[in-house]
Design a protein with these regions (language model features):
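Flexible "arm" and connector segments at domain edges
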Residues: 1-173
Length: 173
């Protein structure tokens, strides 16, 4: 991979990572909140992000085999979005938690295989049109951020569209 291509892909990858950081900061406090989590919660967070990332990698690998152009570009964006955040969680766990917690994480995931598959996908970016990948990245970011409002005024006036179909819950009225 040429230095220019590496820089271009790295820029797209970083843009998606920064968006993932922002998304997770809004959704669950992000990396800054990790110090407040128990070891069990850290294990759950790492394993959950691992599973999400693995699923995105598998979908992208399948799209490459099927030569499904839309899913290839979407998949790369999803992989970039999820992998770097997974990596950040893993680095935190390895650096800040006790050996027992790290050993539990290691017993539940295969970070080396995931990393190798990620690198294999990175090497295939030479086959992509990076302007299209960049456009997809913007769409993925926009879609994910639409899940939250950035307006405090809008948030204060938000009302659920949920209409209960019954007043019964847990067998009681």
């Amino acid at each position: 991979m040429s230095i220019l291509l590496k820089d271009l892909v790295g820029g797209i990858e970083n843009k998606l990572y920064m968006s993932a950081m922002k998304f997770n900061a809004i959704a669950n406090g992000g990396l800054a909140n990790l110090v407040n989590l128990s070891n069990e919660q850290i294990v759950d967070a790492v394993v959950s992000q691992y599973k999400i990332t693995l699923e995105e990698i598998e979908e992208t690998e399948k799209a490459l085999v099927d030569n499904d152009e839309v899913e290839i570009y979407d998949g790369y964006c999803d992989v970039f979005y999820t992998f770097k955040y997974f990596q950040s969680l893993l680095v935190y766990c390895y650096g800040k938690r006790d050996k027992e917690t790290v050993d539990e994480v290691d017993s539940l995931i295969d970070a080396v295989d995931l990393g190798n598959r990620y690198v294999a996908l990175l090497l295939k970016t030479v086959e992509l049109d990076l302007s299209i990948l960049d456009e997809y990245a913007d769409r993925v970011i926009e879609n994910n951020m639409q899940k939250f409002t950035t307006s405090l005024e809008e948030f204060k006036t938000w009302e659920s569209d949920y209409i209960p179909t019954s007043k019964e819950y847990d067998g009681k009225l």
